[in-house]
Swiss-Prot record:
Record's keyword terms, sorted: Cell cycle, Cell division, Cell inner membrane, Cell membrane, Cell shape, Cell wall biogenesis/degradation, Magnesium, Membrane, Metal-binding, Peptidoglycan synthesis, Transferase, Transmembrane, Transmembrane helix
Summary of the function given for this chain in its UniProt record: Catalyzes the initial step of the lipid cycle reactions in the biosynthesis of the cell wall peptidoglycan: transfers peptidoglycan precursor phospho-MurNAc-pentapeptide from UDP-MurNAc-pentapeptide onto the lipid carrier undecaprenyl phosphate, yielding undecaprenyl-pyrophosphoryl-MurNAc-pentapeptide, known as lipid I.
EC number(s) recorded for this UniProt protein: 2.7.8.13
Native organism: Rickettsia peacockii (strain Rustic)
Cofactor(s) needed for function: Mg(2+)
Pathway given in the UniProt record: Cell wall biogenesis; peptidoglycan biosynthesis
Family per similarity comment: Belongs to the glycosyltransferase 4 family. MraY subfamily.
Protein name: Phospho-N-acetylmuramoyl-pentapeptide-transferase
Amino acid sequence: MLYNLLLSHIHNSHIANLFHYITFRSGLAIIITLSLSFITGPILIEFLRSLQKNGQPIRSDGPESHQTKVGTPTMGGIMIILSSCLSTLLLADLTNKYIWITLFGFISFGIIGFIDDYAKVTKNNHYGVRGKSKLLLQGIISFIICVLLEYLDKSPSHLLNVPFFKNLSLDLGYCYIVFAIFVIVGSSNAVNLTDGLDGLATVPIAFTAGSFALISYLVGNLIYSHYLQLTYIPNTGELTVLCAGLVGSCLGFLWFNAQPAEVFMGDTGSLSLGGVLGIISVITKHEIVLAIVGGLFVIETASVILQVYYFKATKGKRIFKMAPLHHHFEKHGWAESKVVIRFWIISVIFALIGLSSLKLR
C-alpha cells in the first residue's frame, strides 16, 4: 500500500527511490513487525488472558514440569499474523499475484488454527477439532492455492528441482499439484507438532523464513538466478518482504514466548506459519530445500509417525519415551531450556546446509 502510493504519487524523491529496493523494504518490514509486536503484545496477551480463564489446556500425561504452564493463554499467533500481514500490505507490491495468494493461504491456515484453539479453550481439553477435519480443510485450501498458481501462471512449471545437483529436475506433470498440496499441508502440521515448548518453534521458523527471504530474492532476480543456476521465476522477489516480516514478527513474539512463556502461539500461529512456508517453497520451486532448512520440523514429525506405527505394530511398545522428540528428551531429564537451545542449534545447522545448496551443485 505505502509502496504503491509512493511510486504513484512521489516519483523523484530519495524516499521513493529507496522503496524501489526490495532489500530496503525487507529491512523496514523487520523493524515494523518487531515494533508492532512490542507495542501490541502486552495488550493482546492481557486481552487473551481475560477471555481464557484456564488458558491453553495442558496434557496430563506430559512432562510434569508442564503443569506450571497452566493458565497461560493461547492464540498468540494472532500477533504474528496481524503484524506480518500489515507490514506486507504496507511495503510489498500489491499488484503482485504471489503476495495475494500467499496472504490468502497464511490467513486461511490461521483461521483453521484459530477454530482449533477456540475448541480447545472452550471445551477445556487438548483435543480441539478432529484431525481428519483439519486435514480436509488444509487440503482444500492448498488445492485452491495450487489451482490459482496454475491458472495465473502463463506457463506453470511442474518440475521438482533437486538441490546439490546441477540441472537435475523431475517433471511430475499434473502429479505436481498433489505433491504441492502434500508439501503445504505437511509443512503446516510439521511446525504444529514442533510447537510444544516455550520458544521452541519460534526461532526455527524465523531461520526458515529468513532462508526463504534470501531464496525468494535470488529466484526472482534474473542475474542472480542465472549466476547460481537457479530456476528464474519472475516477481517472486516480492515474497522477500513477506518473509522478512515473518522473521520480525517471530522475533517479536519470542519476546513474550521465551521461557516462562506469557503466551503460546497456539495452532493459530503454528498452522499458519507452517502453511505459509510451504506455500512460499512451492512458489519458489524449492520444496526439497524447505525439508532441509526446516529439518528440525521433519525430525519432529518423523518421531511422531515412527512412534505411532511402532506402537501399533508391537501392540504397546514405544521407541521414544514420548513423542514428539522434544518431549522424549524432557522425559530423559533434560531441562526445557536445554532442549530448546539445542534444537535451535540443530535448526541453524539445517538452515546453513539448505542455503549451501544454492551454490553447491
